[in-house]
Amino acid sequence: MERKRAAGVLLIALLTLSAAKPYVRQVYDGDTMALSTGEHVRYIGVDAPEIDHQGDKSDFLAHEARQLNAKLVQGKPVRLELDLERNDRHGRLLAYVFLENGDMVNELLVRKGLARVLPKPPNLKYSSLLLDSQRRAMAERIGLWQKDPEKPERYYIGNSDSYRFHRPSCPLGKNISGRHRVLFESVYKACWEGYSPCRQCKP
């Protein structure tokens, strides 16, 4: 009887431990997923191509980014590391996501060329690591970096506050204040410095 009781206690303890360790329940795209706890997580410091959710055409390599994210984390336990700002304006948890082997998913997506860096102050703990990984992917011309822009502009306007850059005709670019306004001669130069393309004008 005592042996059965001890076995039952051990089983309950193991089940409790398993339930307490969060795993990835669903992957939405290249930089967003949901945990078994119900929390939605947005990866810090990266911006993956957008998947078509509104009837528009999905961005280049958007589905490939989601597939890699799913391959890395779907159904697996992960460790989350937070930064200074805990949630975004949508209420999603902002995190660096680590696999059991210690690899950071945010960095792996950038290194494979399936996400761009997007610094978001004050969450800048790993910004240098992510930018170094992006520069390597750019130099190797893999993923998003394998092709040049279809309609290049003479210059691009960057915002040093949001780390987004825009076409000269973009209203968002025109409204950037002088102290945050940065000019780039090419998309490549802007991305090399860690700026990410505007979602509206899509440079």
PLM feature segments, named:
Residues 2, 7-8, 13-203:
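Small beta-barrel nucleic-acid-binding modules, primarily SNase/OB-fold domains
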